[in-house]
């Protein structure tokens, strides 16, 4: 009977160790997935930042060109008078 108890405790111990190891691996996998998601989010933020900057520069250039065109039109109108 004593051998049976020891065997049973040993089997339960091995099962507990196995369960603990699998839980640890599961947490590591989740951490890796979270890290990959964070890296992808950073890439997206960087991309949106570049797009935003390019849009601002394009808007400034368009406004500058429109201002020059308006100034030229006014100068021509004044020059004709």
Swiss-Prot record:
Swiss-Prot/TrEMBL keywords: Amidation, Amphibian defense peptide, Antimicrobial, Cleavage on pair of basic residues, Immunity, Innate immunity, Secreted, Signal
Tissue: Expressed by the skin glands.
Family stated for the protein in its record: Belongs to the frog skin active peptide (FSAP) family. Dermaseptin subfamily.
Functional description taken from the UniProt entry: Antimicrobial peptide.
Isoleucine amide sites (modified residues): 78
Annotated Gene Ontology cellular component terms: extracellular region
Subcellular location as annotated: Secreted
Lineage summary: Eukaryota, Metazoa, Chordata, Craniata, Vertebrata
Keyword Ribosomal protein: no
A GO biological-process term: innate immune response
Record's compositionally biased regions (Acidic residues): 30-41
Propeptide residues per the UniProt entry: 23-45, 80-81
Name recorded for this polypeptide: Dermaseptin-S6
Signal peptide limits: 1-22
Annotated spans, Disordered: 22-49
Superkingdom classification of source: Eukaryota
Pfam families membership: FSAP_sig_propep
This protein's record includes keyword Metal-binding: no
């Amino acid at each position: 009977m004593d051998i049976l108890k020891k065997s049973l405790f040993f089997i339960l111990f091995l099962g507990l160790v196995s369960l603990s190891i699998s839980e640890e691996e599961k947490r590591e996998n989740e951490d890796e997935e979270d890290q990959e998601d964070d890296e992808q989010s950073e890439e997206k933020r960087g991309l949106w930042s570049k797009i935003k900057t390019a849009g601002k520069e394009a808007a400034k250039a368009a406004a500058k060109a429109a201002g020059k065109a308006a100034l030229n039109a006014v100068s021509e109108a004044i020059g004709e008078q």
